[in-house]
Amino acid sequence: MKKHAFSLAILLLPLSALAVPPQQPVSEGIESPNYVWNADSGEKKEILKLKGNAERGKEAYRGCQGCHKPSGAGIPDGTYPQLAGQHASVVVKQIADTREGRRDNPKMFPFAGKHVVTPQEIADIAVYLQNMKIPRDNGKGPGTSLARAKDLYVKDCQSCHGENGEGNAAKFYPVLAGQHYKYLAREIRDIRDGKRRNANPKMVKVVKDYSNADAEAVADYMSRLLMPERSADK
């Protein structure tokens, strides 16, 4: 009797409850000799042609708030990155790379996949985030190796990411100012170890000889960079 009751209950469930969550696709990444970083093709190119609207983006961003928070601040422990103030071009590229399987992010894919978010909504969200003020209370490191970390940053990172961590929208180099220390350290290690499959090969060369201590030190320095004109009030 119990077996029949269970079978009936299963039949009465909505189809959505029985559906298998869509799996993130896999495309060629940096592990492939055919990999081209930031190729001018695919969904990224399509989205960048669209005109984003911040008001619509505010509404569409509601689906992101559970992890990245209404302020775009993410989580200080680095579980989820800080997005507020990020270049729209960078947001578009990273979402497109996730949707097309060049950046492995199984946690994000169910919320950002093509089955959930349209290209226009991505363009809108990207503009909305770019216009947000960068929070100042991001997660920071211990501050014990900042002099050495500054030397590393100036030598290896500043030419692309800027003196104040402002990045470069036209070149798709992300804003680092206000980003969480633990997130930055993890991403540097992943790029070094080949786990960040959509990494810029130039950056792989820069960090290939970094020790974990180097990665953590420079991440600590990056997390303290500040862009006063784009930062939230204290």
Task: Give the predicted meaning of each segment.
Residues 1-49, 89, 96, 223-234:
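N-terminal export/targeting leaders of redox proteins
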Residues 20-26, 76-82, 98-123, 129-132, ...:
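Axial heme c-ligation environment in periplasmic c-type cytochrome domains
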Residues 24-61, 76, 130-152:
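Electrostatic cytochrome c docking/interface patches
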Residues 35-36, 43, 62, 70, ...:
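Generic signal for short, ordered secondary-structure residues
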Residues 52, 56-59, 90, 107, ...:
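Extracytoplasmic/secreted proteins, especially bacterial periplasmic and envelope-associated proteins
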Residues 54, 69, 73-100, 113, ...:
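Gly/Gly-Pro-rich "capping" loops immediately C-terminal to redox-active cysteine motifs
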Residues 57, 64-70, 125, 156-163, ...:
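The canonical Cys-X-X-Cys-His
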